[in-house]
Amino acid sequence: MLAEFIDPAILGFILIGVMLFSIFVGFPISFTLIFLGFVFGYLGFGKLVFYLMTLQFSMVMTEQTLAAVPLFVFMGIMMEQAGLMERLFSAFQLMLAKVRGSLYYAVLFVSVVFAAATGIVGASVTILGIMAAKSMNRSGYNVRLAAGTITAGGTLGILIPPSIMLVVMGPIMEIPVTDLFAAAIIPGILLATLYAAYTTIRCWIDPSLGPVLPPELRATSMKEVWIEFFLGLVPPAALVFAALGSILFGFATPTEAAGCGAMGSLLLALAYKKLTLKKLQDALVKTLEISALIMVLVAASNFFGAVFSRLGTPMLLTDFLLGLEMNKYFILALIMVMIFLLGWPLEWVPIVMIIIPIILPLVEALGFNLTWFAILVAVNLQTAWLSPPVALSAYFLKGVVPEWDLKDIYYGMMQFMVIQVIGLILIIVFPKIALWLPAYLYGQ
């Protein structure tokens, strides 16, 4: 074994370097983690790596909380198939037709509801772009501010429950998913409020950025408005609040609530006569693809993280940084910057499953609340989704609104990236923003 000639902890640093290089050059993440974990584990502590691999994969397969992932994914896809978000957007558009910037408010409100229904960023940005861009163009809205609003609203799916990322993050950080859901609600509403305040101020200073809607886009009667509003808001809101509320108030586990939500979304699609055999098949295939990707990554990263921890590198790194006697908030700032930079080229999945377990011992040693830290990570990754040059949200939006210049989309996103940073700083300075609701609900 190589451990006879080199400190296993140093071997762990080499493992991280090789892993990052392999991912950045394009090797499949799951297979890279399994292969490197096996090779470096065998070099570091021999045949024990076989038992470690079996144990970690078995733990993932028997983790009941992760069963909520495919159910929440299916719930979101069926809500999309039923066309409920389009109806809700139309209702808000009609209600606020005479208000400056009304379409910005409609996008943000729908994005909050849709985030609570799906938890998938790509789907949120795509649907919001399809729904809103045409009306915004016809009404003469500013492309940059419109693009920023759509992409920022779409990224709320990372944070607002039932966020798929929070469902996965809970078992990894050994935090109850209910705590993470409760902690994410107020920060999510805070960010949406900051977005709305920003668009309001911009439209007040320059009314041409969000003019009132032209007559052809307004309702012919208030009856039409209220029918659209009721049919668009009440069913999805009732479904979301039933699923989320049952989790927060302890009536059901996340998996049970996800199962009820999935069945409810299927019934809604049937009630609205939007469900066909082809759409159901597509929804099931999409659910399978997304869920399989996440589950294999969870298992692979669990094994990789276990090997890395067994090599002793996390403790060596923690002892080294604590020995420097730096201010703990300075170390937190360094961690946030690192996660932000990694969020440019990488999806949230490898960051949450690989990087977070590596730095978790350090965060615990510094005495930070793990629930609060998890919300900081979520908001930080949301910020990275809005940050050029990679900015994955920009490409989702460009794909459905090709007439918008990518430069304008980038410029619009950067405005909201600054708002995200302000929100992140507020949560750091005032931890109660994230921790008050879990404490109130669960007495922590």
Model-identified regions with their sequence ranges:
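Long, contiguous bundles of hydrophobic transmembrane helices that form the permeation core
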Residues: E4, I172, D179-I290, Y395-Q415, ...
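Hydrophobic transmembrane alpha-helices that form the pore/transport pathway of multi-pass ion
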Residues: Q93-V168, W348-V377
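Short amphipathic alpha-helical coupling elements at transmembrane boundaries
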Residues: L55-M59, R87-K98, I127-R138, A147, ...
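Hydrophobic transmembrane alpha-helices of multi-pass solute/ion transporters
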Residues: L2-V69, S90-A91, K223-L248, T255-V296, ...
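Membrane-interfacial helix-loop connectors
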Residues: F40, I127-S139, M169-A182, L311, ...
